Regions:
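Alpha-helical segment of the N-proximal tetratricopeptide repeat
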Residues: 5-33, 43-50, 140-167
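Register position in tetratricopeptide repeats
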Residues: 16-17, 50, 84, 117-118, ...
Length: 261
């Protein structure tokens, strides 16, 4: 059975219906012919965890990480397994690693927030809360696209992102995601156009404008970059990161005295 003929959506639907035995049976059948199928190994681990077959779940994750060591969702699953087994310190380390590899994993952020809050680490808790708030505001399909994009599945991410934008042409988060894909593929003109339009739709979004400034910088449009950074500093005068970017741009343009003011 070829990888692209296996019906992952049917399996995930079974899992949503909590028919984990049925889903796992389908996954194991496919793994017999495709033992290194990333998604099958991951979903088999999830099914095994829900069925409380924790040793099997660990074995699936071990196999998965041998062939795909940078899959954030796998580390999130390791976090779940360690948390269930009472190994909270290890669980937090895995959740943190999951978020570093894939910042769109809201479950990991939730557990990190609860842990940091309980341990009175306000700065870390506030950061986790900010990420959770951002992710909760995103439609589920865009959250999924973010996750697969972070796993390097550019073709699928682009296809689904374009489908979403056809129905929601002014959604700036989707435009930003598509710009990330274009940037990774080296299509810098497309990246610039997408971010330019996104900034027009949402001019008060500092993160969007910063991304726009960075692609302008990458394309060596120094004057336009400086214009965007100046706007950021005017709109967000207390943001030290934006101030640092402006100083860097001034230095790049040769005005050293102005940069240190």
């Amino acid at each position: 059975m070829k990888e692209n003929t296996f019906d992952i959506e049917k399996v995930t639907y079974s899992m949503k219906e909590e028919r984990f035995v049925e889903a796992l049976s389908s996954l194991e059948f496919n793994l017999a012919s495709q033992p290194n199928h990333f998604e099958c190994l991951y979903l088999a681990a999830v099914c095994s965890r829900y069925l409380k077959n924790y040793k099997d779940a660990q074995n699936y994750l071990d196999r998965l990480l041998r062939v795909n060591p940078d899959m954030g969702r796998a580390y999130q699953e390791l976090g779940h397994l360690n948390r269930i087994n009472g190994k909270m310190r290890s669980a937090i380390a895995y959740y943190r690693q999951a978020c570093e590899l894939n910042p769109a994993l809201i479950a990991s952020w939730n557990y990190l927030f609860e842990y940091y809050k309980k341990n009175k680490n306000k700065q870390a808790a506030d950061h986790a809360a900010e990420q959770i708030k951002k992710l909760q505001s995103i439609p589920n399909i865009l959250l999924y696209i973010s996750q697969i994009l972070n796993e390097g599945k550019l073709a699928i991410a682009e296809e689904k992102c374009r489908e979403f934008l056809k129905k929601n042409p002014t959604n700036t988060y989707a435009m930003s995601l598509l710009s990330d894909i274009a940037d990774r593929l080296g299509h810098f003109d497309d990246t610039e156009i997408l971010l330019e339009n996104a900034v027009k739709f949402k001019p008060e979004d500092g993160e969007l404008r910063m991304k726009y400034a960075l692609i302008l910088r990458k394309k060596q449009k120094f004057k336009e970059t400086m214009e965007q950074v100046n706007i950021l500093c005017e709109k967000f005068p207390d943001n030290l990161s934006y101030q640092a970017h402006r100083a860097s741009e001034v230095m790049q343009n040769g005005d050293h005295e102005k940069a240190v003011k």
